[in-house]
């Protein structure tokens, strides 16, 4: 009887060699991140490659400035001179330290807003474009709606804490995807340094707050954001071999570490950059930087 069983088993194996040769199923390793919400999006197709509470409404801090910058570059008033109002000059936290009556070109304010995360520059731009920040915010929300961002409501142009001011990781990726189609926006957010110039000859060298531009091969933008309520936030874009990936992380314990893990995941499952270790960023939080 045992001999017959052995012959039967050998016959089955002989007739079905695929049973022996079948490779084990490949298990995709999803990156572990500290962010409470995150998304990875293919910038060319809009496909979501990874999501973690990506539709959850959260304070976006200075990631708000992506929409402000997007609307600004679409208006194309680059060489127009802007006179800084008292309202803009009094806007606190991260800023260019603008004074009432200062004059700068629209372009210089735009660089200050997107690279240095200057809150005062955002208000000056908003007032120049729409007459008041309140009216400009209506335009921001309209544009968000047109892009299909259903979990977004802006209350100001810079992302400073405000009741009912929120967005989601997914919506912010959608906004970034649209903004990066604008050549000037894509150029500005990729710059590491820029000298902001006032009309009277004063100038200020600003450095991009996005350190991935200096540390992650292929990084081409976009924006940092930090408030006590929002935590560490970041939108990052990188490209490799023709593939472009958008990463958004919200309320992260280490936004740059999380972004690297998600960019690596989106660009190539095998790629290991190893440029950032898993250390939590510490220090005073600068509101909406």
Report each predicted region and the residues it spans.
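Active-site-adjacent loops and short helices of periplasmic peptidoglycan-processing enzymes
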Residues: 22-170, 174-183
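Soluble, non-transmembrane domains of envelope/secretory-pathway proteins that act on or interact
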Residues: 1-2, 113, 287-289
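Sec-dependent N-terminal signal peptides of Gram-positive bacterial secreted proteins and lipoproteins
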Residues: 4-23
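Non-catalytic cell-wall polysaccharide-engagement segments
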Residues: 19, 139, 209
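Sterically constrained small-residue positions within well-ordered secondary structures
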Residues: 13, 29-31, 238
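Domain-terminus/edge residues, biased toward the C-terminal soluble/receptor-binding domains
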Residues: 149-153, 161-289
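N-terminal cationic leader/targeting segments used for protein routing and processing
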Residues: 3-4, 278
